[in-house]
UniProtKB/Swiss-Prot annotation:
MF (Gene Ontology): ATP binding; poly(A) RNA polymerase activity
Cysteine-cysteine disulfides: none
Keywords: ATP-binding, mRNA processing, Nucleotide-binding, Transcription, Transferase
GO BP terms, alphabetized: mRNA processing
Enzyme class, spelled out: transferase
Enzyme Commission number(s) of this protein: 2.7.7.19
Protein name, per record: Poly(A) polymerase catalytic subunit
Function per UniProt: Polymerase that creates the 3'-poly(A) tail of mRNA's.
Length: 470
């Protein structure tokens, strides 16, 4: 038994380690030593500053914060399960090595904010957006309440923190969705702030601890199997606080961005295409039916941005958009004719099952597929003048084996997302797809082809119960 390691473990556990504890935990002695020497007083002062700046409405005393912190950092002394000890060590290590740089820094003076003038008056676009969405308002309203609509009372506090976080960490974290559009158009209301970042797990763990030490709430982190690299933070009532997609730094570098008030947002062009794509999902059409006004102002803002950026003339001349597409329902593959545009391929095979795409890419023996993770929700491969990709939403039919225009437009938008992420010029097809929204009549839904079913178990990080499952 190494005496130095044994002393580190004894100090950490508050007891002489058993032989089992020694031999299973000795590989962690460096991390344990970091926890042992961690200055809790400085840490508590950072928590106090975070509370004052972002959670001032929470009624927690300094003594309560101290107790919660010291209780957690001595929790191992009353824990004898090796599995739970490993969990405590892992979470404590993340906290002591990352908290200051990730969340503690938010309380210090930040760089000057360079105010942006990238704001849009969307009044001229309201009618076009409203008419376009009205032509797509064809779903029956569902009474089902989606999990994303159960919002925690802490969202406003976390939003305040996130605004500062996005400014301080704008190389590793960017936003999209309603908050990003609020920066373009202050009339847009937003709930939580949607983010993409390169260190999502670490950030959410640090945030979970901050909330725990300020509120005493037993918040948990959930990893959802059907959304890649996605984690959501929930409060003790199972209500949504914030979620985040993790992406690689390589993907982050590919994403077109716009800087507004020191915050990077996903280029609204990508967001418009993503919205057109998402409208093929039946759940989103149900949301549209429930609250068309909410989507109209967002849609109008995106259209106005794209019109300005690309100089698009809105005349209803859509040329070849949406691109012609046929579906093989049995194989669940859609073939899109892309030859009308200056792409590096003449057709596109759009798979509705991701495993089938992966299998076919493997059989092609090609190693140059690209994957933009949650930005595109698909890998892409160009091989022999054909683009191979996967579409993650439902596909609507307007007749027997006939793809509904909403879905064919969504699939065309998906292809344009690939073109944009690869830094290709999309001005002509983008102009056409925007004009394809004008002067359309409602088409009823004949059939809904279901989306790919993802299997797997939820992963969980529960600080209170010392559980980490992957």
């Amino acid at each position: 038994m190494n005496r130095h390691i044994s002393e580190i473990l004894e100090k950490y556990l508050g007891r002489i380690p058993s032989l089992t504890e020694y031999h299973t935990l000795k590989s962690q002695y460096k991390n344990i030593h970091r926890v042992n020497i961690f200055n809790k007083d400085i840490f508590i002062s950072l928590i106090k500053k975070n509370k004052k700046k972002f959670f001032s409405d929470i009624d927690t005393s300094v003594s309560e914060i101290k107790k919660l912190v010291f209780d957690y950092f001595t929790k191992q002394e009353q824990t004898y399960s090796i599995g739970k000890l490993y969990t405590i060590i892992e979470l404590q290590t993340i906290l002591v090595t990352t908290y200051t740089d990730i969340l503690g820094v938010l309380t210090t003076k930040g760089p000057d904010i360079f105010s942006s003038n990238v704001q849009y008056n969307t009044s001229s676009m309201q009618k076009i957006a409203s008419d376009a969405l009205n032509s797509m308002n064809i779903a029956t309203i569902s009474d089902k309440v989606m999990g994303r609509h159960n919002v925690s009372s802490l969202v406003c506090n976390v939003n305040s923190l996130m605004e500062e976080y996005l400014r301080r960490h704008n190389k590793s974290c960017i936003c999209y969705g309603s908050y990003s559009l609020h920066l373009l158009n202050p009339e847009i209301k937003y709930g939580d702030i949607d983010i993409l970042q390169t260190n999502s797990r670490t950030f959410l763990i640090d945030l979970a601890f901050l909330i725990k030490f300020i509120t005493g709430y037993n918040v948990i982190l959930l990893k959802v199997p059907y959304l890649k690299n996605y984690m959501v933070l929930k409060d003790q009532n199972d209500s949504h606080i914030i979620d985040s997609f993790n992406i690689r730094q390589e993907t982050m570098q590919h994403i077109p961005k716009v800087l507004i008030d020191n915050i990077y947002i996903v280029d609204p062009t990508i967001q418009l295409l993503s919205m057109l794509k998402m409208l093929s999902q039946i759940d989103r059409l149900e949301d549209l039916a429930k609250n068309p006004d909410k989507l109209t102002i967002r849609f109008a803002t995106l259209l106005e941005y794209v019109r300005n950026k690309y100089g698009i003339i809105l005349n209803g001349n859509s040329n070849n958009m949406p691109m012609p597409a046929t579906i093989d329902i049995k194989k669940r593959i859609i073939t899109v004719d892309t030859k009308y545009y200056n792409f590096a391929y003449d057709k596109c095979y759009v798979y509705l099952d991701e495993n089938s795409l992966s299998s076919d890419i493997l059989s092609l023996n090609a190693d140059d597929a690209v994957d933009f993770e949650n930005v595109s929700n698909s890998a892409f491969l160009v091989n022999d003048k054909t683009l191979y990709t996967y579409f993650s939403n439902t596909v609507l039919l307007s007749g027997n084996d006939k793809i509904h225009e909403i879905s064919s437009r969504g699939i065309s938008a998906h292809i344009l997302i690939y073109q944009a992420l690869m830094k290709h010029d999309i001005s002509i097809p983008l102009t056409d797809i925007v004009n394809s929204l004008i002067g359309r009549n409602k088409q009823p839904i004949y059939e809904i082809i279901p989306r790919d079913k993802k299997t797997g178990k939820h992963g969980i990080i529960d600080i209170e119960k010392d559980i980490i499952t992957h």
